[in-house]
């Protein structure tokens, strides 16, 4: 990997984090997971008549082939979240490497702050599908704090990396009283001026425009302190989604191999002390 302005102290973690994202990207580009992008089904003459009647493949599936409807819906949602995550994170990390930290933090907003809530709903919220399908004004990324904390805590039951708790992820991403949380720093990156009491820009200032070398060092520090835990957390949730929702199509023997690979990647960034 070629480094530009990234300080030496962050390079091992940067490299490991980039590898975690590449491992997640295997769900998009790997031949073992092609089923996420290709679904085939034979249609009888009766099915074709029903499809003509409905005029839309989604309406047809929902009315006449409900099981296939939910399978295809899950594939579209998970694949979309995977692409968002990988594409935004790769660009964010590349911008960090080039010291374009305002762009780097702005790019964290959609995949980490917003899309995580949708992934949590898919995995944990029993009412998600009814709301998503039936309500025109439903926003799955809107979530009150109590519900968000509850769903994050529920992930502790399905993940293997127990030290990275749901409550810790909340502190890293969503805690408004934490100046270094992703939501606070991404807000500052997106908006020239922020006015909330916990994230106020202040007089004679614009967010990220008067950044000193000391400020830049602190921004890098926050970025690489939280990023490994967030990526491991996300990697495990994507594993739960793919290997939980598509058991009939995925090779389940790949699951432990992915966990082993994840552990090896992180060991390169945090080697055990002898």
Regions found by a protein language model. Give the residues of each.
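A cross-kingdom marker of C-terminal helix-rich interaction/assembly modules
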Residues: 1-77, 95, 131-147, 181-274
């Amino acid at each position: 990997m070629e480094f530009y302005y990234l300080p030496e102290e962050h390079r091992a973690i940067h490299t490991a984090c980039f590898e975690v994202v590449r491992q997640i990207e295997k769900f998009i580009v790997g031949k073992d997971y092609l089923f996420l992008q290709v679904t085939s089904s034979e249609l009888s003459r009766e099915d074709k008549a029903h499809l003509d009647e409905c005029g839309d493949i989604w309406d047809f599936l929902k009315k006449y082939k409900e099981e296939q409807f939910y399978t295809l819906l899950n594939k579209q949602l998970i694949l979309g979240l995977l692409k968002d995550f990988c594409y935004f994170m790769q660009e964010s990390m590349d911008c960090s490497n080039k010291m374009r930290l305002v762009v780097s933090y702005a790019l964290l907003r959609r995949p980490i702050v917003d899309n995580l809530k949708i992934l949590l709903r898919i995995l944990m919220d029993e009412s998600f599908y009814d709301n998503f399908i039936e309500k025109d004004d439903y926003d799955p990324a809107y979530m009150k704090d109590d519900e968000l904390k509850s769903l994050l805590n529920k992930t502790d039951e399905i993940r293997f990396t127990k030290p990275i708790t749901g409550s810790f992820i909340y502190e890293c991403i969503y805690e408004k009283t934490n100046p270094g949380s992703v939501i606070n720093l991404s807000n500052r990156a997106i908006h020239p001026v922020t006015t909330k009491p916990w994230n106020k820009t202040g007089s004679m200032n614009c967010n990220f425009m008067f950044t000193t070398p000391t400020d830049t060092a602190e921004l890098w520090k926050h970025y690489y302190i939280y990023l490994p835990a967030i990526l491991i957390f996300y990697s495990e949730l994507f594993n739960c989604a793919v290997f939980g929702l598509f058991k009939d199509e995925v090779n389940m023997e790949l699951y432990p191999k992915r966990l082993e690979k994840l552990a090896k990647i992180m060991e390169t960034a945090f080697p055990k002390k002898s």
